[in-house]
Amino acid sequence: MPIFDLRVVCLGTTAAYLATLLNGSMFTHSEPGKIRWHGLVPAKAMHAAKSRLGRDELVAAFLIDTVTALLESSRVACVSVITADRNLEALAKSLGAQAVREPTPSGLLHALQLGMHTVPPSMGTIIALGDLPCLTPTDVNAFLESADLHDSSFISDSEGTGSTMWARRPASTALPHFGVRSRATHRENGSIEIPGSPRAHRDVDTPTALWDAIRIGVGPATMRALEETTPTLATISGLDPIKAVDETGHQRTYPDYTLIEILAPKIGQRVQIDPGTKHITLAQ
């Protein structure tokens, strides 16, 4: 029986072989008798990621919810985040994941190749993009139950042209493809498409996709980030510094916010407060 738990620490290849010699099996929290999976999550530097969304807080929140879904899956032994961003590296470690440092940003496929070299050959590989805020451990488990049966497999994105997750069994030489037409490329290369829940299909790289993710249901980190960055309507209740009461009756002070096209703010004036830009504008 395994005596170690990989839920907390993801051990490298050498340690994995040592465990095999000591215990007769890889030590992991995965279910007995099934493939043990190593999760990989590529993460762009925050200043380069999701420019169409324009909020670093959301990018980090997406990553947190994605990594957490993998870490809490009963089928995933450990998770590594591949990134050149030191802040995201620290974030990954704070979640209990391992960080694989990308020396310089060289593109998604290069980052994945770097990460795949760290996966012990006796383990399967599951790759999830870092922008899956709706993903849950149940979704991951369901995908891997099917991935157990195929050399390589994948889940397409909501638009039906790309991919959100991909997996290959131990000893497989299959390679992943993400981005435009990756669904077709995966199928052409023999990967099996696995049907998933709307949560597993929904990646987020545009405001429209974010709206759809909110409709489906996002994870707790993304929900908190949205609450902290979504513009709200309020009524000015104090001046110098600006105070305002939101629609729930809570009053807050905004000393470092900039008034936009409001030359002489007045108590009782209706405004929109945007935490993302720290702007206060007249309510429309």
Predicted regions and their residues:
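Conserved donor-nucleotide/metal-binding helix-loop-beta segment in metal-dependent transferases, i.e.
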Residues: T138-S158
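Beta-strand/loop nucleic-acid-binding surfaces
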Residues: H250-A264
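N-terminal nucleotide-binding beta1-loop-alpha1 segment
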Residues: R7-T14, M26-L53, T235
